[in-house]
């Protein structure tokens, strides 16, 4: 072999040596800067995520050299790459724990057994069916806990757990040691999500301490302490906030349980965490890895880092980004969300049915949701790979940055007196509200898009029919509230736009099926009007407006007369910035003379305020553009035409 080819930097063709990595990156950056033609690199190619972290267009080894966890393996502290060394053929890497709606415990059991035969391998037990021993026994009839562990978040109070589960186990002829899974109480998240508790936190902690101590002696395979931070995401918060809140709640439980004579060594293995899965694939994947890192750090502070591996993580697809409109797109959303969770190393996953925000999920939607989780494991074989994302420079760097962001937020909560004190003072609510406000603004300007709702809506879609599936009864609510706070209220990204479409549908129903209309006054050749005509049609379609006006016009007067004659209450002039100074005065004056009540809109926003003012004086009522508040503007226009 030649000496040239022996060199690790030699060109395979025998030419010049391959430049080192630093030189290649420098050349790449110089080439990119040249192509950007003066546009700042950071503005064009760097994306700021909701967590306040910059996503780079290119990641390289140098970015992760200082990241401390990169040389660890799955099953090794700090367990960022998973609590266990996974990847063996046939090994269950994660449990599939699907929600099963049912009107009674018997119906639930029947549907559950059928689901277990079709690939589900964990029981997600509704709190309503854990209210008494008889109901619980009926719900869990013929369920073998070794093959299908039970996940039962019972709510704020642990008082009845020992009696109800003890009674159910006795009726089955089994000991407590047979029970596997997580039977958890979580008063802190219940208080945050609902704003009230039927008992004091001190009383709730005493119940949780008693249940945890009992389980530690009698039910070694059962988690008892729930920490559900999903309310942060459902309230519009970001991943860093969700992680910080989860850690803050766990530390609050540690303190309170220690005061109730349950030490950290007993409590740490009993934690069962739950998170909502958001829509951003890589940040969500990194979130679950970052959680393990943070949890290991917390448990290490209490004396034994190895105990961190025993906590379990359940992930459920969030409701925040699910839609009533174009609901079949929800299947795509839940698929990528579930994938990010399982690649992030969760212990169990719950995939929401595509119609869950529309109606009680039917048999079809439940089957599709279950099959998504099964396919990730059985067909795509992700269960056979340990930490498949490990080693990705993007994932490793983002994991590290996200963990640091979350830890900083956690420290702020601690300075506020811990989670309970911060919640009582409204600080947790303010934290989430700030992120939610940013998301609302991004949604309203379509910087954050919801496909089928505020982007590319389908006005011809047929709504889903009513479900014949009975809903699961709600768990008993406390008669009185012993503790109250302002709740972190859940909302959905699409709900404001869905409300606009509902107004539009009512308008159509009251007008013989005719939707509210907007006339597009297209000027000149296709290249002159098409970009803004397409933008305008999409803009108004978000609120259910039908765009009319197929032909293009040579003169502004012609366009104005056609708009007035169309019967549409709104007309949009679609052309280019350089033609508007000539077109606007003639169009607006002719239009208002022919039909004084019509709303005149200009597609585009002039760069200077003086031109905007002159166009308004000419008769233009408003402007639509990429920075416009879409939702507010459409709501105002619907109101102007009498739609309610």
Walk through the language-model features, giving the residues of each.
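A general structural motif
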Residues: 329-332, 550-556
């Amino acid at each position: 072999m030649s000496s040239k080819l022996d060199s690790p930097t030699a060109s395979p063709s025998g030419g010049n040596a391959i430049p080192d990595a630093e030189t290649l990156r420098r050349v790449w950056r110089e080439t990119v800067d040249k192509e950007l033609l003066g546009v700042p690199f950071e503005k064009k190619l760097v994306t700021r995520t909701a967590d306040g972290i910059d996503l780079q267009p290119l990641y390289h080894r140098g970015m992760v050299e200082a990241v401390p966890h990169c040389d660890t393996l799955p099953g090794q502290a700090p367990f960022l790459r998973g609590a266990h060394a996974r990847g063996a053929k046939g090994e269950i890497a994660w449990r599939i724990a699907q929600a099963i709606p049912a009107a009674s415990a018997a119906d639930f059991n029947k549907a559950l057994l059928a689901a277990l035969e079709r690939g589900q391998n964990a029981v997600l037990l509704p709190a309503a069916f854990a209210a008494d021993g008889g109901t619980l026994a009926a719900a869990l009839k013929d369920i073998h806990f070794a093959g299908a562990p039970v996940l039962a978040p019972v709510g704020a109070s642990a008082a009845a757990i020992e009696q109800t589960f003890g009674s159910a186990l006795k009726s089955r002829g089994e000991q407590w040691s047979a029970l596997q899974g997580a039977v958890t109480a979580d008063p802190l998240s219940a208080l945050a999500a609902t704003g009230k508790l039927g008992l004091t936190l001190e009383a709730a902690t005493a119940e949780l301490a008693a249940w945890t101590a009992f389980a530690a002696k009698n039910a070694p395979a059962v988690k008892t302490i729930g920490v559900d931070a999903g309310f942060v995401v459902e309230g519009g918060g970001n991943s860093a906030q969700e992680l910080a809140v989860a850690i803050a709640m766990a530390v609050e439980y540690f303190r309170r349980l220690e005061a109730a004579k349950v030490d950290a060594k007993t409590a740490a293995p009993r934690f069962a965490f739950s998170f909502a899965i958001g829509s951003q694939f890589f940040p969500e994947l990194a979130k679950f890895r970052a959680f393990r890192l943070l949890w290991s750090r917390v448990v290490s502070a209490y004396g034994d880092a190895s105990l961190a591996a025993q906590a379990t993580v359940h992930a459920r697809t969030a409701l925040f980004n699910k839609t009533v409109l174009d609901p079949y797109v929800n299947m795509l959303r839940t698929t990528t969300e579930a994938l990010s969770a399982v690649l992030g190393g969760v212990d169990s996953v719950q995939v929401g049915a595509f119609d869950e925000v529309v109606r009680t999920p039917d048999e079809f939607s439940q089957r599709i949701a279950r099959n998504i989780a099964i396919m990730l494991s059985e067909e795509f074989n992700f269960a056979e790979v340990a930490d498949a994302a490990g080693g990705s420079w993007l994932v490793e760097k983002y994991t590290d940055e996200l963990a640091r962001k979350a830890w900083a937020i956690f420290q702020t909560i601690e300075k506020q007196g811990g989670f309970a004190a911060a919640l009582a003072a409204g600080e947790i609510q303010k934290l989430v509200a700030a992120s939610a406000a940013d998301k609302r603004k991004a949604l309203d300007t379509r910087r954050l898009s919801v496909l089928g709702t505020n982007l590319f809506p389908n006005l011809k879609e047929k709504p889903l029919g009513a479900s014949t599936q009975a809903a699961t009864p709600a768990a008993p609510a406390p008669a009185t509230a012993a503790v109250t706070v302002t709740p972190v209220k859940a909302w959905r990204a699409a709900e404001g736009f869905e409300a606009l479409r509902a107004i539009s549908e009512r308008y159509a129903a009251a007008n013989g099926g005719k939707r509210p209309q907007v006339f597009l006054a297209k000027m000149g050749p296709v290249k002159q009007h098409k970009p803004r005509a397409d933008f305008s049609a999409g803009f108004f379609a978000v609120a259910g407006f039908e765009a009319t006006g197929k032909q293009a016009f040579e003169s502004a007067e012609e366009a104005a007369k056609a708009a007035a004659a169309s019967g549409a209450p709104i007309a949009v002039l679609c052309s280019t910035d350089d033609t508007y100074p000539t077109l606007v005065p003639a169009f607006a004056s002719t239009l208002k003379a022919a039909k004084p009540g019509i709303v005149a809109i200009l597609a585009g926003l002039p760069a200077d305020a003086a031109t905007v003012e002159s166009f308004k004086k000419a008769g233009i009522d408003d402007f639509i553009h990429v920075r416009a508040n879409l939702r507010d503007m459409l709501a105002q226009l619907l109101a102007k035409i009498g739609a309610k």
